[in-house]
């Protein structure tokens, strides 16, 4: 494995390979933080709107925007607590939303699968 690339595996749980190490994200993140990271990572580095995330996770909340902001803050903090990831910014704030784009080359297994499947159609 090339340590300058980050591999994200979503098909079998949620693991991240980086720097010669494999991290089972279920060991580091709460269920909600894990779900939020999954949704962001599935968007292939595209902006995910706040409205979409609030409707998906906090539809019945009295203050969904506050809940979203708190959970993004918490997710960023939890990721920084993993020693190998302390210098990587995973989640960028964009106008109207958030974008998952680590500052290293990232390969998500679901994106590879979609590309391979499209090639055989």
Predicted features by range, described:
Residues 1-34, 91-97:
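Short boundary/linker motifs that mark transitions into or out of structured domains
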Residues 16, 53, 75, 97-98, ...:
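Short hydrophobic/aromatic patches on the structural cores and recognition surfaces of FHA
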Residues 25-56, 75:
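Short amphipathic alpha-helical recognition elements used for nucleic-acid or partner binding
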Residues 29-38, 61-83:
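DNA-recognition element of transcription regulators
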Residues 47-52, 63-69, 86-91:
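Short N-terminal amphipathic alpha-helices
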Residues 84-121:
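A short linear beta-strand->loop->alpha-helix hinge motif most characteristic
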């Amino acid at each position: 494995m090339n340590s300058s690339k980050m591999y994200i595996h979503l098909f079998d749980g949620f693991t991240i390979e980086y720097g010669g190490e494999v991290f089972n994200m279920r060991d580091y993140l709460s269920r909600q933080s894990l779900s939020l990271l999954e949704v962001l990572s599935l968007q292939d580095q595209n902006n995910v709107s706040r409205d979409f995330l609030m409707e998906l996770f906090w539809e019945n909340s009295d203050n969904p925007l506050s809940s979203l902001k708190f959970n993004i803050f918490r997710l960023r903090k939890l990721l920084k607590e993993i020693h190998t990831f302390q210098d990587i910014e995973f989640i960028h704030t964009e106008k109207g939303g958030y974008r998952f784009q680590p500052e290293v080359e990232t390969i998500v297994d679901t994106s590879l699968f979609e590309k391979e499947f499209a090639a055989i159609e």
